[in-house]
Each structure stands twice: as C-alpha cells, then as structure tokens.
Amino acid sequence: MNAPLGGIWLWLPLLLTWLSPEVSSSWWYMRATGGSSRVMCDNVPGLVSRQRQLCHRNPDVMRAIGLGVAEWTAECQHQFRQHRWNCNTLDRDHSLFGRVLLRSSRESAFVYAISSAGVVFAITRACSQGELKSCSCDPKKKGSSRDNKGTFDWGGCSDNIDYGIKFARAFVDAKERQGKDARALMNLHNNRAGRKAVKRFLKQECKCHGVSGSCTLRTCWLAMADFRKTGDYLWKKYSGAIQVVMNQDGTGFTVANKRFKKPTKNDLVYFENSPDYCIRDRDAGSLGTAGRVCNLTSRGMDSCEVMCCGRGYDTSRVTRMTKCECKFHWCCAVRCQDCLEALDVHTCKAPKSADWAAPT
C-alpha cells in the first residue's frame, strides 16, 4: 500500500497543517518558499481563502512580503539576542517558531507586532522603489505645504505608508478576523500596534535650494526610518506589555491587575505568563539555554547566572583574527595589521537530567 511519490508531495502541505501546532500566521513560512507565485500561494500551509486570493492577485507584493520575513525575523533575533528565548526559528516548521507561540505570552505579542510591522515596511519600501504594480510614491504629497520652518514644496518620493498599512491589514489580519476567540483578538491588537509603530517613525526629509545653500526654497518628502527604530520601540512595548483578560461579553480586554492602566492601541497585550525557557521543553516549544554563550561580567539577562539558570557554565579558549596596530596614512587611508586574539568563551551547561536533549 505504498503511495506513489507524486501523491506524497500532493498531500504534504495538508499533512504539515494537520501535524504542526496551530499558529495563525503561517504566511511567515513564505520566507522559505520559492518558485512561481501560484506554487507559493497554493503550497504555504494554513493560508485562508482571503490570503490566497490576495496572494494570487498580487504576486509582486507577496515577493516583497517574503523578503521582508527575513528582515523582521533578524530584527526579532537582534532584540532578543541577550535573552533565554532568542527568537530562534525552525526551518522545517511552517509556523517558523514552532510551539512557543501557542502560548499567549509576551513573546507571542512581540512576534505578531514585529511581523505585522515588517509587512508594512517591506510593502511600503517596494512601492517607493517602483517594484509593485499596484502602488508607487504617496500620491497625496503634491503641491506646497507649511511646517514650523516655513513653506516648502512636496517633491521626491514620499513613502506610501498608507498603502502598506492597508494591504498589511487585509493580508495579515485575514485569519484572525475569521475567529472571535480571545487569542484572535490578542493577535489583532498586537498586529495593529506593530503597524502603528512603523508609521510613528515616518519623518520629513528636505533638501535646500538657493544660492550657497541659503535654503530659500525647500523640497520635502516623507520617509520611513530604519527598521531598527521600529524594533527598538516594540522592544520597549514588550518590556512594558500589559497582561489582560477577556471582558464579560467577549468583545475586548480588561487588565488582569486592576492597579495597571488600560492598554492603549500602541501597547502590546498578552494573556499567559511566559515559561522560563531554561530547559528544552517539547510542550512549551522551548529549546533551553544549554550551549548558549553567556557574559561572565554582565549583571543583565545575558549574564551567565541568569542565562544559564544557575546551572553553571563551561569555559573554552578560542582565537580569532582581529585588526590591530591601525595607522592613518596621508591621505586618506587607515592601514591595519591582522592579529590573532585569544579570548575565553563561556557557554551554559546542560541540565543534569537525562531527558533535556529530547527533540521538540
């Protein structure tokens, strides 16, 4: 009763959807999916009909979103680089992060926010670079206007962030809008907070025209800030995320602790406390911290005491090539020697229990 090989590939997306944890944003897997737009749209597991429809109609936008996935996951990993959970991704899992996001935790709140922000950023940038058929520069930024420095003319290419937000809302929120449960409402709230974060750092840039740079005339445009600003802002929101519970009629949230203020549209919200991420735990989706590099002199989250959860650490001596004895040569170059540097690297010990290395 061996199935033909072609039949196995035909059913593989369905099997992945059935066997994998139910995480709403399976579109994250678009990072790893290549080929034609039809192959991509039909073989990313878990997309709802509205998402597939948008995917088929806008293959150029989907390419931009797919490229953006790598960017926002890298930003997530940068923000969590010194923490026990370091936003690690699983290449073989269509949810990208595995079971860790099944919990309605602070980490889930951050990932949904940064991913939604990443879609806005990727689409808006692609619009300005002329890569999309459906949008270009912001058409509303025309003619003259005023600011606190006087009159200026709109020129150049203003980032069309309203289009990016509109498409991101339609595509990213599509699955959550089909459900009325608490997790769907949590995801929608954090998705919106992520989109708003990108727009928060839209800035006006100007170029002066006139004799000797006198700036008698100014041409201005709106541009998104580097995505790092959005990541830093959402990290602060993660640190101050508000724990909530559903209200009695199931239409919104109320704070879990009455001493805290009601969350705004810019805040991140979560329902469940996070696991400690110390040990590998299949159910929690935690990979643990065994083998993670720690900082012996730090007192923060990256310290060996905190990162290793009190288990201790191993120290190894390694060498690396660095630039040294750099000298400035007129004009205008800096020349350096290549030197070998020896340093100690500290890594967290594994738990003593025999089952810590069980695969997740």
UniProtKB/Swiss-Prot annotation:
It is found in: Secreted, Extracellular space, Extracellular matrix. A lipid is attached at residue 212 (O-palmitoleoyl serine). PROSITE patterns: WNT1 (PS00246). Residues 1-25 form the signal peptide. One of its GO terms (biological process) is cell fate commitment. Keywords: Developmental protein, Disulfide bond, Extracellular matrix, Glycoprotein, Lipoprotein, Secreted, Signal, Wnt signaling pathway. Palmitoleoylation is required for efficient binding to frizzled receptors. Depalmitoleoylation leads to Wnt signaling pathway inhibition. GO terms for molecular function: cytokine activity; frizzled binding. Ligand for members of the frizzled family of seven transmembrane receptors. Probable developmental protein. May be a signaling molecule which affects the development of discrete regions of tissues. Is likely to signal over only few cell diameters. This is Protein Wnt-2. It comes from Carollia perspicillata (Seba's short-tailed bat). The lineage of its organism: Eukaryota, Metazoa, Chordata, Craniata, Vertebrata. The gene is WNT2.
